[in-house]
């Protein structure tokens, strides 16, 4: 194709993504669009087609973004090329959403006709507005008995400030309104800007590892074009590779002769090492490089940290390889090696949130068959030392000596909770119990309220979400963003077994809750740790001060069984001998800590605050 034909083709390209709160019907709508444009034959069609990970299908959530090319013949008789970039809706995967949106010019905003606007709908709309996208509202599930499209239309105008007069009324399940959505995309979403005659600039928005072809890049071409045989260069590190194949996804990968401005597809270039590519980097041609890289993504900082250790220590290298491969596909995962006296060699991993941590753990266990032990999650604290230094500490075992600590600051989040009016009291009580500070409260309509609190992130990473769902019967929706660091009265609590610290059980706690938390965990460990041949004291300590203690009684053999009657001094001698043996055992014996003990530190959080 000459450059004139390519420019003509570019005018008929539409790049869009679908954004929505969890469960508002985003993946079903994507399925219907694929059917309507006959991208997928009815034989291959299955529910949630784009959610290719088993985990996504089981949980019914979208975790990874997906990019697909569709062909659509519009009512005006022209053929259009659509690129649908599917995005996750969950708050932990906002980073995936922001990456998808950077590759689009438009966004289809799906709102449930019965539930209306939810917290993550808002969060994703703001991301779309930041990227200057054209937003097309769609009111979905209009065939539900509880649907109230007019109220939702009003909400979209009042809460988001979008003109919803032309919002499409649709039902993705029944296939109503799908054609209207496609026509609106043709009319309202702008064609990609960019110039095919300029040097190549392509944004990497994802990458996957293929055992045969190495790293495969998923890119959005912003300027120029790329074809097999070209030599590409990464702008962040200057490394060059020869392109072996370019193509598109329909969800299956299909090779093409070229990718030009506006296209979304993949590049395979025999990239062998995972570290050579980074999501957000710009690809250009080595022969005619672009002057500057594209404006990439802001680097996401992990907010929740946990130790991951293989149960079998010889699997350490397998775990490292598995984490490297996951990191390639999930740019927000960070990890570094660490050792623990209790658990051996492992990694300290950073995650965006608890669901992210959960998903990574499941993917490691499923896709790579590695059995893991996870330690309790913690957040990044700022510890101010008396000599004026400030340390960032994410691992409780790295906390400095309490006598050298001047003050400790912890991250607070701005939590936005949307909830029906009848549950406002329960939500406020929960937030108060989690050390939250009330900020403001707005009424969205007669029945729904948007409550904003500042809450310490450490309280949220435990089980805030579960508690919120149970106290509002599942009606609350929740979104959070990091607000600031604040000074808090925090202490590090150590757990001692038989007088020895178990570093993996240490945790940071607010001074006001230290005694209850210590007492609770000691009692819990007493039930979990099996009885030994000798007595085992379990202690909770802050520095040198023991705040709680419980003893696991020793198992003992009845040494008097063979004394029928007989002299009391004989019996006493046998008992004294047994006692001396137990004492010697206690001095040298070590206690095995079962996996449940580490998990119990997680699950006990709220029992102490009831």
Curated annotation (Swiss-Prot):
Residues 11-193 form the tr-type G domain. The keyword Ligase does not apply. InterPro entries: EF-4 (IPR006297), EFG_II (IPR041095), EFG_III/V (IPR035647), EFG_V-like (IPR000640), EFTu-like_2 (IPR004161), G_TR_CS (IPR031157), LepA_C_sf (IPR038363), LepA_CTD (IPR013842). Its EC number is 3.6.5.n1. It catalyses: GTP + H2O = GDP + phosphate + H(+). Keywords: Cell membrane, GTP-binding, Hydrolase, Membrane, Nucleotide-binding, Protein biosynthesis. It is a peripheral membrane protein. GO terms for molecular function: GTP binding; GTPase activity; ribosome binding; translation elongation factor activity. Its main location: membrane. GO terms for cellular component: plasma membrane. GTP binds at residues 23-28, 140-143. Gene3D superfamilies: 3.30.70.240, Elongation factor 4, C-terminal domain, Elongation Factor G (Translational Gtpase), domain 3, P-loop containing nucleotide triphosphate hydrolases, Translation factors. It is found in: Cell membrane. One of its GO terms (biological process) is positive regulation of translation. Belongs to the TRAFAC class translation factor GTPase superfamily. Classic translation factor GTPase family. LepA subfamily. Required for accurate and efficient protein synthesis under certain stress conditions. May act as a fidelity factor of the translation reaction, by catalyzing a one-codon backward translocation of tRNAs on improperly translocated ribosomes. Back-translocation proceeds from a post-translocation (POST) complex to a pre-translocation (PRE) complex, thus giving elongation factor G a second chance to translocate the tRNAs correctly. Binds to ribosomes in a GTP-dependent manner. This is Elongation factor 4.
């Amino acid at each position: 194709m000459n450059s004139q034909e390519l420019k003509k083709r570019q005018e008929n390209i539409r790049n869009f993504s679908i954004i929505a709160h969890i469960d508002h019907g985003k993946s079903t709508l994507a399925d219907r669009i694929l059917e309507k444009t006959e991208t997928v034959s009815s034989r291959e069609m299955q529910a949630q087609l784009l959610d290719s990970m088993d985990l996504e299908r089981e949980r019914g959530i979208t975790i990874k973004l997906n990019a697909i090319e569709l062909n659509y013949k519009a009512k005006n008789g022209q053929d259009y090329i659509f690129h649908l970039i599917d995005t996750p809706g969950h708050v932990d995967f906002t980073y995936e959403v922001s990456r998808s949106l950077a590759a689009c010019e438009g966004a289809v905003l799906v709102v449930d006709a019965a539930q209306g606007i939810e917290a993550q709908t808002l969060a994703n709309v703001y991301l779309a507005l930041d990227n200057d996208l054209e937003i097309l509202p769609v009111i979905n599930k209009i065939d539900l008995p509880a649907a109230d499209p007019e109220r939702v239309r009003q909400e979209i105008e009042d809460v988001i400030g979008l003109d919803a007069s032309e919002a499409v009324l649709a039902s993705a399940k029944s296939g109503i309104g799908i054609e209207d959505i496609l026509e609106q995309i043709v009319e309202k979403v702008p064609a990609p800007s960019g110039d095919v005659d300029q040097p190549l600039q392509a944004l990497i928005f994802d990458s996957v590892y293929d055992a045969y072809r190495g790293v495969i890049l998923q890119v959005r071409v912003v300027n120029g074009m790329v074809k097999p045989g070209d030599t590409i260069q990464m702008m962040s590190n200057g490394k060059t590779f020869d392109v072996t194949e370019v193509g598109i996804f329909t969800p299956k990968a299909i090779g093409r002769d070229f990718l030009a401005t506006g296209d979304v597809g993949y590049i395979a270039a025999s990239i062998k090492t995972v570290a050579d590519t980074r999501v957000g980097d710009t690809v250009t041609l080595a022969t005619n490089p672009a002057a500057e890289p594209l404006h990439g993504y802001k680097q996401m900082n992990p907010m929740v940290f946990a130790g991951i250790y293989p149960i079998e220590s010889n699997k350490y290298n397998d775990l490292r390889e598995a984490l490297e491969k996951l990191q390639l596909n999930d740019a927000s995962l960070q990890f570094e090696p660490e050792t623990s006296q209790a658990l051996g060699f492992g990694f300290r991993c950073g995650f965006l949130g608890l669901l992210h941590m959960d998903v990574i753990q499941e993917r490691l266990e499923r896709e790579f068959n590695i059995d893991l032990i996870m330690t309790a999650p913690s957040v990044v604290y700022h510890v101010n030392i008396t000599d004026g230094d400030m340390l960032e500490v994410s691992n409780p075992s790295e906390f400095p000596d309490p006598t050298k600590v001047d003050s400790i600051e912890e991250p607070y989040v701005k939590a936005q909770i949307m909830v029906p009016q009848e549950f406002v009291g329960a939500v406020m009580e929960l937030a108060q119990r989690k050390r939250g500070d009330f900020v403001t409260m707005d009424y969205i309509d007669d029945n729904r309220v948007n409550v904003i609190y500042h809450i310490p992130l450490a309280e949220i990473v435990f089980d805030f979400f579960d508690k919120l769902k149970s106290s509002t019967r599942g009606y609350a929706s929740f979104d959070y963003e990091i607000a600031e660091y604040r000074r808090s009265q925090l202490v590090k609590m150590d757990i001692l077994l038989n007088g020895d610290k178990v570093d993996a059980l240490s945790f940071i706690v607010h001074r006001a809750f230290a005694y209850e938390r210590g007492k609770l965990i000691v009692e819990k460990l007493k039930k979990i740790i099996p009885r030994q041949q000798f007595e085992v004291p379990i202690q909770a300590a802050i520095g040198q001060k023991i705040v709680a203690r419980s003893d696991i009684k020793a198992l003992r053999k009845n040494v008097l069984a063979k004394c029928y009657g007989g002299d009391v001094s004989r019996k006493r001698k046998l008992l004294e001998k047994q006692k001396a043996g137990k004492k010697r055992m206690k001095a040298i014996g070590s206690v095995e800590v079962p996996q449940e003990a580490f998990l119990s530190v997680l699950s006990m959080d709220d029992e102490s605050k009831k």
